[in-house]
Amino acid sequence: MLLLQCRNPTSPPKPCGLVPNVKMSLLVFLGLLGVSAAMPFQMPMPRMPGFSSKSEEMMRYNQFNFMNAPPMMPMGPYGNGMPMPPHMPPQYPPYQMPMWPPPVPNGWQQPPMPNFPSKTDQTQETAKPNQTNPQEPQPQKQPLKEPPNEAARAKDDAQPPQPFPPFGNGLYPYPQPPWPIPQRGPPTAFGRPKFSNEEGNPYYAFFGYHGFGGRPYYSEEMFEDYEKPKEKDPPKPEDPPPDDPPPEASTNSTVPDANATQSIPEGGNDTSPIGNTGPGPNAGNNPTVQNGVFPPPKVNVSGQGVPKSQIPWRPSQPNIYENYPYPNYPSERQWQTTGTQGPRQNGPGYRNPQVERGPQWNSFAWEGKQATRPGNPTYGKPPSPTSGVNYAGNPVHFGRNLPGPNKPFVGANPASNKPFVGANPASNKPFVGANPASNKPFVGANPASNKPFVGANPASNKPYVGANPASNKPFIGANPAANKPSIGTNPAANKPSIGTNPAANKPFVRNNVGANKPFVGTNPSSNQPFLRSNQASNKPFMRSNQASNKPFVGTNVASVGPKQVTVSHNMKTQNPKEKSLGQKERTVTPTKDASNPWRSAKQYGINNPNYNLPRSEGSMVGPNFNSFDQQENSYFSKGASKRVPSPNIQIQSQNLPKGIALEPRRTPFQSETKKPELKHGTHQPAYPKKIPSPTRKHFPAERNTWNRQKILPPLKEDYGRQDENLRHPSYGSRGNIFYHEYTNPYHNEKSQYIKSNPWDKSSPSTMMRPENPQYTMTSLDQKETEQYNEEDPIDPNEDESFPGQSRWGDEEMNFKGNPTVRQYEGEHYASTLAKEYLPYSLSNPPKPSEDFPYSEFYPWNPQETFPIYNPGPTIAPPVDPRSYYVNNAIGQEESTLFPSWTSWDHRNQAERQKESEPYFNRNVWDQSINLHKSNIPNHPYSTTSPARFPKDPTWFEGENLNYDLQITSLSPPEREQLAFPDFLPQSYPTGQNEAHLFHQSQRGSCCIGGSTGHKDNVLALQDYTSSYGLPPRKNQETSPVHTESSYIKYARPNVSPASILPSQRNISENKLTAESPNPSPFGDGVPTVRKNTPYSGKNQLETGIVAFSEASSSQPKNTPCLKSDLGGDRRDVLKQFFEGSQLSERTAGLTPEQLVIGIPDKGSGPDSIQSEVQGKEGEMQQQRPPTIMKLPCFGSNSKFHSSTTGPPINNRRPTLLNGALSTPTESPNTLVGLATREQLKSINVDKLNADEHTTLESFQGTSPQDQGCLLLQA
């Protein structure tokens, strides 16, 4: 330190005065060189552990150190003296070459001695040779404007490094003999070597990265990074991490060849190996690192060598940034080329950080994260664009000084950057001219220095590759250390982009579990959302979200959300689930402002089912991201609502900007601002009130159709009950998160799964709205119905439709219009809603007619379902969602609505994300079919099993169970509304239906024998009870629904997709899949349902089969039914699945209804009821009339009966077998559904006529089990 002090305070002669100049030079050089060589090695070693990048960079820069860069670095330091560059390069290479190369110093000891005085001269001369000095000093000055802070910081950093090691900046050790003054100058030299960095891309021994702030700068920068992360500069140092490449870029900038070569190699290196690998993640990582661990990126950036140098370069980088944002094709290419990661880079890495993460991290994330991200990609420049100025310091890690004179160093970077490029031609030409000596470091040094930056990219660029392993690895390697913040943070930061998405992106990881999974998942997912969304919406998040995403975090989240919904929607980003989640979470806050806070909370909870974070309604705004919700909520209509409650359509309005689909959708019923989400409520008869909107983002029209009716009235009037139900719907939405996937297929199917369109067509509108109309008949939704008057055509149609099928046909039209809208879903959902609603009336009225017999039967379904609805608001909807979403059922039932939403939805969201993607496709089909058919015969839901789904009656048939579970989960009251009103007008008094039937329905009568979770799906439960819970014999009859052998394979795929979708699909699907002869019936079921759906168009009974299959197969309730009604293995299996967590809870939560409905029947329902049904078949038929009126069980049993009944099944079996690519087993189920439909027709008529015996007789073939189901109902 004495030497340093002597040298530092005094010009080199003074150290020479202390010691003979030669001795001093030798001692200082040898000591400093040895220490610097040793110390940088030592320091790199510590930094290596701490900052892989830095240590590696240091090591690499140690390579630099002995490379020409050190001589250049002295040149830079002497250049700090400023006169040095031209003269110094020759002298430096001789003098400093000895200095830098450990071997040389002995030979060069004397030359250094002369050079010491000469170095003072050289410093002057160097400043002179840096004829760019006018430029360089200006760049320095300009940088010094900002660098004063940076330089001061660099000084502080450099000076502390001076004390830290005598050569505080790894650079100093080398140049310190020349830098006695420059050392204090060096921070200033950093200010000035900034252009020395420009020139010397030693950037104070940029090559040695002693100039990087010196390695000691690394050492300190390690601290500095840690400190600066606290400062706001960490993002700026994040920029320097991008500037790690920027040094190369700086070199690149300085040396045009180096710039092109280095930048390209660096970019290429970074882009392909690291840009993609490190930067790709680091694009995400760095942002996150910047976000969370900006210090390490900062360190990386600083480690990159010249935080202070970065100052000038940041100005330079701003140009790069301007070029880079997208212009930087290396960066852009990486970002975009690494579409997947690139989206991370592109959206997450670059755009996401800016847009997606930027919004979250915004200032620092944008600043540092972008910088880091681009810097990570080795495009210090692309990051610079991301960073803005972040990469202004790209060559020089001036990303730190990114905000300040950096821009001057964009202006001055034309000057300074031109010193970096121009002065680098001048200065860099010294480092190109002198880089024969100096520029050989930049070319030699690019072989040396640029090789540091290329060699050093092996060294420095390897820091950018190595250091990207080191520096980029800082962004991965030093990100183990610094970039571990950038990778720790990249685990933190990239993981923030995944990890810090755990951290920052954990907001985006909560989201990015959904969102970070989007950002990782979503960068796979969010990044894919932001890939997907960034492809579309994340690009909006990049572009629009530069505008919109910047705001996006706030409200553009809503805007972004819808847009992403549209994007994700069209992209059918199942990954966007995660992505979308991230977005969802982002959107959460906007969604949060949805009119229904509880629903918003639910939505948010729903949308962030995986992330409990969204629970905070603000958080769930992210889910409002339709890119996420579009996935999740799109997949799950309820999730959509959860993401953006229908009430939150205002948020959807916010989302609407992004969710273009939402905008049109919600436009049709903008009065129901929240309604757009209903669009997803294809299967949201119950939930659409609250959840459909978010989920229906893709189907705003459907959702709007639904939500207008359902959501507003429930939200407004049934707020307590309906809202509670909607909470269930919201959680049903989350439960519908599987539905979400289900709905997402709507979203996607809008684009991808058009088959789901039938479902969506019917489901969103018919399902939700007809149910709402029916439910409107119910006390709950009567209010809603009044408020539904926006959609009153459907409401009245439903209520009126129930009496008149043309009304149902209208609703069917509406519902199919919804599907049409669903086609529009992305865009014109609302408009097509009513419009297409009528067109579908034309096509579907026949189905309603076909369903008309079931219309009479349908009242039972509504009745049965309605009882589900009635209790459902509080318990039944939880039960239904729970039953439907077995995982969710418990929470819903236990926690009236919200707990279930949270419980099952979180779990189910993951499950639905897992399973829903495959299943929502099928479910979309099923829902399309079921809802479509059901919607067609809104009260002939019985006629078309699918119709059961669309409407509560259909829901009640067991499809209704599933969909109603979804709906019930989302809008249990709505479902009550729909089902009950429809049912009430015909079969039961509202009060009776509501109270009595609800419980009966909730019991799922026979079906809920296993589990009461199917309150709404009583039909489905009964269906499934016959199928699932009923003994194998009952399963024979129930086979259409859940006959393990036949219907499970057939209907069950339908069931699971449509009914079991969210939770039960996971549970029932898993169980039934495990237990079912056709474990992959869902896989088959989707094709079957889809096939059947086409056949549904062709053959309503086939559709009914599909629908019934789905009704059976839609086993949210069926799952409990499976559980309990399967009396044996299935119930046990499902019970194992459900009971531990949800069945018991569900039973507890649904005790009033579930116990009343099916829990008592669980044990006895399958066996006892079967025995009773067999023993008391006639007796039960007579007893059954009240129960028989619970045709849902008949629907199921009818299916089962059809399944058992050979002739009807056989008659239709070939059709369905042919029509539905179902296994013969599935075929019987389908046939059962057909037979059931026919039977249900007659039974329904009889039932409407109160001819229960006739109904029983119709089911008499199935009586033992049908009656068992009926008995359970009774």
From Swiss-Prot:
User: Bias category Low complexity: which stretches?
Assistant: 128-142, 273-287, 318-330
| Main subcellular localisation | secreted
Q: Which domain of life is it from?
A: Eukaryota
Give each disulfide bond as a residue pair.
Answer: none
Alphabetic keyword roster: Biomineralization, Extracellular matrix, Glycoprotein, Phosphoprotein, Secreted, Signal
Q: Name one GO cellular component term.
A: extracellular matrix
Q: Cite the residue spans of the region called Disordered.
A: 103-413, 476-610, 668-700, 712-734, 753-814, 1071-1097, 1109-1128
Q: What PTM annotation applies here?
A: Phosphorylated by FAM20C in vitro.
Q: Which GO terms describe its biological process?
A: ameloblast differentiation; amelogenesis; biomineral tissue development; odontogenesis of dentin-containing tooth; positive regulation of enamel mineralization; regulation of cell morphogenesis
Regions of biased composition (Acidic residues) lie at: 787-801
Residue stretches of biased makeup (Pro residues): 103-115, 174-185
Tissue-wise, where is it found? Answer: Expressed in developing teeth.
Cleavable signal peptide: 1-38
Q: Where is the composition biased (Basic and acidic residues)?
A: 143-158, 225-239, 575-587, 715-727
Q: List compositional bias (Polar residues) regions by residue number.
A: 117-127, 249-272, 331-344, 486-503, 522-549, 565-574, 588-598, 753-766
Glycosylation: residue positions: N130, N252, N259, N269, N300, N1066
Question: Phosphoserine modification sites?
Answer: S196, S219
UniProt protein name: Enamelin
